[in-house]
Structures are given as structure tokens and as C-alpha cells.
UniProtKB/Swiss-Prot annotation:
Domain notes: The F-BAR domain forms a coiled coil and mediates membrane-binding and membrane tubulation. In the autoinhibited conformation, interaction with the SH3 domain inhibits membrane tubulation mediated by the F-BAR domain.
Species this chain originates from: Rattus norvegicus (Rat)
Compositionally skewed regions (Basic and acidic residues) per UniProt: 163-176
SUPFAM superfamilies (alphabetical): BAR/IMD domain-like, SH3-domain
Phenotype upon loss of function: Reduces the density of caveolae.
SMART domains: FCH (SM00055), SH3 (SM00326)
The name this protein goes by in its record: Protein kinase C and casein kinase substrate in neurons 2 protein
Subunit and partners: Homodimer. May form heterooligomers with other PACSINs. Interacts (via NPF motifs) with EHD1 (via EH domain). Interacts with EHD3. Interacts (via the SH3 domain) with MICALL1. Interacts with RAC1. Interacts (via SH3 domain) with DNM1, SYN1, SYNJ1 and WASL. Interacts with CAV1. Interacts with TRPV4. Forms a complex with EHD4 and MICALL1; the complex controls CDH5 trafficking and coordinates angiogenesis.
Length: 488
């Protein structure tokens, strides 16, 4: 950058023109800036991709949490479905934002990275080849002109110095004329000094003008050479600018979900789901399932009390699913209506390893039978929990009673056990046991407990796999035998 001197002002005035020596460096720096801008754009897209991913994850987590809350909450019916549709929208939008993230990183980011690698070539000594070529081109184009400019600056400085000396000499001569003590010889020297300064001024002026003329002659070529190198830099920068514009348009397409058909479909479906909510239908559903529209098992006359116990036992047996055992079906109540078949029910009875033979039946009241019927023969070791209505309605002699000696259904096993149909029989020994699993009583005579709870077994396991026990609270009831273990 050249500097001019103004005698009247006495300050330096600098020029910021491209044509000044060294001012081409801004154009060269633009090449390095282009490489840095590629990195900045990649970082920009990378951060946006991270935001898209984080937003997608937050949407998914939000949808998951609120789906569970709504499912477990009191909302019901079509409004619940409409509410759930909002969570479905979030999940689907989350997928779209993950696609945006993938597009930004896999397409746009990689595209910039590859272009940067192809456009800028690093050198072994540092910097880029393109930067060095531009630097060398400008330096070569500017070198002759810069040399002439240096000569002009030197000539200008010499001329300005000569002019100052001339003015100083003239001022001294004028002052000496007013001094009477100055002899003529000294005055003559001052006049000679003025003459010499005038000659120096003329000489430096000619040299200054000559240097300027030579500089002017080299300026056109200098401008042409500098323009040529500058245009090369412009072409390189134009490629970068056009590439950035192209990439940013691709980014816009990836970010603009409003043009994605599936995105529009998400909100169309959401609107339809919400509009499908029907308050009247929900109220009708609640009335039918939780209100006056529910069915009711109104109390009716019951013939005998033991029938309720039989139904309770059968209900509990139906709930138990044993891996092995004998399945009894078709419990028929007989008597005056022995010729009519009642609806059959399944009863699963676990097999007992101690039993050496299986149930043999010629007439089984627990099997679905035709109108002809057949006789029944039971193995002595089979202990049925309940007596079917068939046995209850048989005609017995007048002297028949509940006494075991006269009870035709009374049998004694090898160990001398008493009547297997007597539910009040106890094992005699109380044992402390610990629950292995959680169990929630399904009927009023069943116990409920959690895994790890301790209770007291007061009756051994029956043929259906149930034990009678007592909780520490004092409640007595039945529980599955395989849900506990004895405390050692």
C-alpha cells in the first residue's frame, strides 16, 4: 500500500483500492475462506441433523409415555381413540424427522464434503494449491508495476525534499537581509544556496515526472494481468457460490415436510380420527358396560345350599389349568329330570402319582351322555371334591343316613382316610409356607398374597391342587398349592 504526503495537511492518506500493492490478498484469502465456509456449512447441517434426531426421540418418548397414561387412565370410547391418534401422529412425524436427519447427513453433508475435497487440494507444506496459484499469479502480475511505483515514490520523496530545502533557503535569505550584522559574503552564500535548491527542485521534478510516465506506461499491462488472475479467482468462487446455492435448495427440500405426501396424510388421518369421536356413542357404551344397561344376576330361589358350594368349586376348578390330569365334563343333575341333559362344563383334576390305576367308568355323570345313560364305577383312591347332583338325587333305603358306615359313597383308601367328599377334613398339622408368586383371589373364599409373603397351611393339598391356609391377619381361605413352598 503506497503512502502520499500532503505538505499542506501533513498527514498520511492511504488507499484501499484493489490496485494498490498487496491489496490482492483479500481475493486470495477468499479462496481459504471458501474452504472454511464448506466446513461451516457441514457443521451447520450436522447440528440441524442432531436437532432433528433429538426432536424425533422426544416425540417418540412423549407418545410412548402418554399412550400408556391414556390406556391406564379413565378415558374411554371414541374420544380415547381420538386422543391416541395424537400419539400416533407424533410417532409418524418422528419417523419423518429421522428421515430428514438421514437426508441431511447422508446426502447434503456428504455432498459438501466430497465437493470440498475435489475443489481444494492441500499441499505438503500447508495451505491449498489453489491459494498458492492465485498468490503467485497476482504477485507476478504486480511485480513490474510495483517496481516502477517504488521508483515513483522515491522520486516523489526526493522532489518534495528539494522543494522544502528551497523554501527554507528563501526564508533564511529574507531573514538575513533584515540583519545588519550579516556581512555580504554570508549573504552571497545564502543566495547561492537558493540557486542550488532551485536546480535540485527542477532536477527532482524531471526525475519524478519521468518515473510517473514510465509507471503510466506499465499500468495498462499491469491492470490486464491483474484482471486476468482476478477473473480466475472469480470463476473459482462462482463455482463455490453456485454449489452452495444448489446444496441449500436440496436442504430446503429435505426440511420442507409440507411437500411430503405422507406428512399431509398424517394430519388428514388425525383430523378424521378426531372428528370420528362421538360423545353420544361413548355415553351409550358407558351405560351398557358400567351403568344401568349392565346385566344383573338377580337373586333367585335356590333349592339346596350345597349347590352353591358345588358351583363355587367347579368355577375354581375351571380356572385351574393343569399340565396333566383327568378332565371331567358334562356334569348332569339327575333325579326327577334324569332324562334331561344339562349344559356341560369342564373340570380339570390333577392326576395323583400315588394312584396306580385310572378312572374307569361304565356310567359317569361327568361325561356328556345320550338319553340311554350307563352305570358308574370309581377307583377307590379317586377323591372327588364335590358330589354330583346325580348321587344327591338317588333313592336310598329308609335307614340311610350320613353315617359313614351306611354311606354307599364312603370309601377308605390304603391309609385309612375318611370320606373323600367331606370338605371339613383337616390334615391335622399346621405348616408355615412362603409365597413363590403373586396370587389374587378370584372368589370370596380364596386368599390373596404377594410373592415373599408368609402364611400358615392348615390343610394339605386336595385332588384339585388347592390348600387351605390362614394369613397372618387371621383370614382363612384357599390358595393354589404350587404357589407356595414350605419354610425350612
Amino acid at each position: 500500500m503506497s503512502v502520499t504526503y500532503d505538505d499542506s495537511v501533513g498527514v498520511e492518506v492511504s488507499s484501499d483500492s484493489f490496485w494498490e500493492v498487496g491489496n490482492y490478498k483479500r481475493t486470495v484469502k477468499r479462496i481459504d475462506d471458501g474452504h472454511r465456509l464448506c466446513g461451516d456449512l457441514m457443521n451447520c447441517l450436522h447440528e440441524r441433523a442432531r436437532i432433528e434426531k433429538a426432536y424425533a426421540q422426544q416425540l417418540t418418548e412423549w407418545a410412548r409415555r402418554w399412550r400408556q397414561l391414556v390406556e391406564k387412565g379413565p378415558q374411554y370410547g371414541t374420544v380415547e381413540k381420538a386422543w391416541m391418534a395424537v400419539m400416533s401422529e407424533a410417532e409418524r412425524v418422528s419417523e419423518l424427522h429421522l428421515e430428514v436427519k438421514a437426508s441431511l447427513m447422508n446426502e447434503d453433508f456428504e455432498k459438501i464434503k466430497n465437493w470440498q475435497k475435489e475443489a481444494f487440494h492441500k499441499q505438503m507444506m500447508g495451505g491449498f494449491k489453489e491459494t498458492k496459484e492465485a498468490e503467485d499469479g497476482f504477485r507476478k502480475a504486480q511485480k513490474p508495476w510495483a517496481k516502477k511505483l517504488k521508483e515513483v515514490d522515491a522520486a516523489k520523496k526526493a522532489h518534495h525534499t528539494a522543494c522544502k530545502e528551497e523554501k527554507l533557503a528563501v526564508s533564511r535569505e529574507a531573514n538575513s537581509k533584515a540583519d545588519p550584522s550579516l556581512n555580504p559574503e554570508q549573504l552571497k552564500k545564502l543566495q547561492d544556496k537558493i540557486e542550488k535548491c532551485k536546480q535540485d527542485v527542477l532536477k527532482t521534478k524531471d526525475k519524478y515526472e519521468k518515473a510517473l510516465k514510465e509507471l503510466d506506461q506499465t499500468t495498462p499491462q499491469y491492470m490486464e494481468n491483474m484482471e486476468q488472475v482476478f477473473e480466475q479467482c472469480q470463476q473459482f468462487e462462482e463455482k463455490r457460490l453456485r454449489f452452495f446455492r444448489e446444496v441449500l435448495l436440496e436442504v430446503q427440500k429435505h426440511l420442507d415436510l409440507s411437500n411430503v405426501a405422507s406428512y399431509k396424510g398424517i394430519y388428514r388421518e388425525l383430523e378424521q380420527s378426531i372428528k370420528a369421536a362421538d360423545a353420544v356413542e361413548d355415553l351409550r357404551w358407558f351405560r351398557a358396560n358400567h351403568g344401568p344397561g349392565m346385566a344383573m344376576n338377580w337373586p333367585q330361589f335356590e333349592d339346596e345350599e350345597w349347590s352353591a358350594d358345588l358351583n363355587r368349586t367347579l368355577s375354581r376348578r375351571e380356572k385351574k389349568k393343569a399340565a396333566d390330569g383327568v378332565t371331567l365334563t358334562g356334569i348332569n343333575q339327575t333325579g326327577d329330570q334324569s332324562g334331561q341333559n344339562k349344559p356341560s362344563s369342564n373340570l380339570s383334576v390333577p392326576s395323583n402319582p400315588a394312584q396306580s390305576t385310572q378312572l374307569q367308568s361304565s356310567y359317569n355323570p361327568f361325561e356328556d351322555e345320550d338319553d340311554t345313560g350307563s352305570s358308574v364305577s370309581e377307583k377307590e383312591d379317586i377323591k372327588a371334591k364335590n358330589v354330583s347332583s346325580y348321587e344327591k338325587t338317588q333313592n336310598y333305603p329308609a335307614d340311610w343316613s350320613d353315617d359313614e358306615s351306611n354311606n354307599p359313597f364312603s370309601s377308605t383308601d390304603a391309609n385309612g382316610d375318611s370320606n373323600p367328599f367331606d370338605e371339613d377334613t383337616t390334615s391335622g398339622t399346621e405348616v408355615r409356607v412362603r409365597a413363590l408368586y403373586d396370587y389374587e383371589g378370584q372368589e370370596h373364599d380364596e386368599l390373596s398374597f404377594k410373592a415373599g409373603d408368609e402364611l400358615t397351611k392348615i390343610e394339605d393339598e386336595d385332588e384339585q391342587g388347592w390348600c387351605k391356609g390362614r394369613l397372618d391377619s387371621g383370614q382363612v381361605g384357599l390358595y393354589p398349592a404350587n404357589y407356595v413352598e414350605a419354610i425350612q
